[in-house]
């Protein structure tokens, strides 16, 4: 006697209403074929449950903008955040159910603001790009640096992804019989036909989440300045088919929303349906839920937009934004702090040896200087 699980029985009922067989087929044959279909579907579901899913999430953004704090909260790790000096890696795991393998999220964080943008080539590879998502964290409390940080980092990722896609296309063309075939990378992002303003936007090549951090400081800004920042980020997010959310690590309710978006990118979970486009509140706008008509034109009162001579809509928004918040490049020009002198990375034995070698080097320099002076006197 055949024995089937409850899953097979429920699937069998569903198939019985949808399965059509020729009238000449005997009832027993129909029954057998339905059982086989049900058993095959159960086996397929079980094999999917046993397959480990691996995704990559790349965090970047404003220097000291709260990236590490946000990541630790999303991973529910009770650790004190430390400055990210260059590029750091960690991972997260989540089980889909009881006694099932845990899905893995590879998590990369870029430190230093825009100064180390060349390092994007490390996490973005031909292997990772097929399941890659990007999180851009922008410090709302420093609006003067916001546009330049955003533009440079997004361009760095765009360039690297394009490079990976191009290499894949070249490899495809080198295969016999594929020279004249048009190649579309399987990871290339394709928007639904009913996506708002589909013909007017430039979708980012991989899923993108823009986070406006330190909302607790930003909400005390002048209302007109808040309006400029909020509308500009709404435009940028919609233009790149990205999600946008404002948050503060001091707000549990806002951080819970961040966790939902993060889990969606890292593990494929539902991101929720919360939507908040009120400029007087923290923005929560999932990709595909905004439009240019809802965003409206750039917010500016003391300049004639027609006099800005913009090349395209994005350039117009940039010029209006930088008219209100001119870029202050001093903060980005500062070099990263020497990690060898940072007390949080102290190693007593190594530091002692380093100090000894430094003293020996200084003594060598002094002796060398004396010998050169002696030579000069002799001549």
Predicted regions and their residues:
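Extended non-globular C-terminal regions
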Residues: 302, 306-379
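G-domain G4 guanine-recognition motif of GTPases
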Residues: 137-142, 165-188, 195-224, 244-256, ...
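Inter-motif core of Ras-like GTPase G domains
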Residues: 118-143, 147-167, 179-182
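Glycine-rich phosphate-binding P-loop
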Residues: 55-75
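Switch I (effector-binding) loop of TRAFAC-class P-loop GTPase G-domains
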Residues: 42-44, 48-50, 75-106, 113-118, ...
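Short, flexible boundary segments at extreme N-termini or domain junctions of P-loop NTPases and their
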Residues: 1-62, 91-95, 104, 116-117
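Short coil/turn segments at secondary-structure boundaries
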Residues: 46, 50, 70-76, 82-87, ...
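Canonical P-loop GTPase G-domain recognition
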Residues: 218-290
């Amino acid at each position: 006697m055949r024995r089937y699980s409850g899953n097979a029985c429920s699937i069998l009922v569903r198939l019985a209403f949808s399965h059509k067989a020729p009238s000449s087929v005997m009832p027993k044959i129909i029954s057998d074929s339905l059982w086989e279909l049900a058993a095959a579907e159960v086996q397929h579901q079980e094999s999917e449950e046993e397959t480990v899913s691996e995704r990559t999430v790349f965090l970047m953004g404003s220097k000291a903008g709260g990236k590490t704090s946000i990541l630790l909260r999303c991973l529910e790790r009770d650790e004190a955040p430390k400055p990210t000096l260059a590029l750091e890696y960690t991972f997260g795991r989540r089980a889909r159910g009881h006694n099932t393998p845990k899905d893995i999220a590879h998590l990369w964080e870029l430190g230093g603001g825009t100064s180390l943008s060349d390092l994007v080539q490390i996490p973005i590879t031909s292997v990772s790009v097929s399941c890659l998502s990007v999180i851009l964290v922008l410090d709302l409390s420093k609006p003067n640096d916001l546009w330049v940080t955003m533009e440079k980092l997004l361009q760095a990722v765009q360039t690297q992804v394009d490079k990976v896609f191009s290499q894949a296309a070249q490899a495809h063309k080198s295969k016999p019989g594929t020279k004249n075939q048009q190649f579309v990378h399987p990871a290339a992002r394709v928007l639904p036909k009913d996506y708002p303003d589909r013909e007017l936007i430039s979708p980012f090549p991989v899923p993108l989440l823009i986070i406006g951090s330190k909302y607790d400081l930003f909400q005390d800004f002048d209302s007109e300045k808040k309006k400029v920042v909020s509308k500009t980020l709404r435009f940028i997010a919609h233009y790149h088919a990205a999600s946008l959310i404002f948050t503060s690590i001091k707000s549990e309710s806002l951080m819970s929303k961040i966790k939902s978006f993060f889990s969606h990118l890292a593990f494929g979970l539902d991101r929720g349906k919360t939507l908040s486009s009120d400029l007087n509140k923290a923005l929560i706008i999932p990709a595909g839920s905004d439009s240019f008509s809802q965003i409206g034109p750039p917010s500016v009162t003391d300049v004639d937009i027609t006099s800005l001579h913009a090349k395209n809509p994005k350039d117009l928004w940039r010029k209006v934004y930088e008219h209100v918040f001119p870029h202050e490049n001093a903060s980005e020009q500062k070099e990263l702090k020497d990690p060898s002198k940072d007390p949080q990375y102290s190693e007593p034995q190594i530091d002692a040896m380093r100090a000894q070698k430094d003293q020996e080097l200084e003594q060598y320099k002094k002796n060398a200087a004396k010998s050169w002076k002696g030579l000069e006197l002799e001549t």
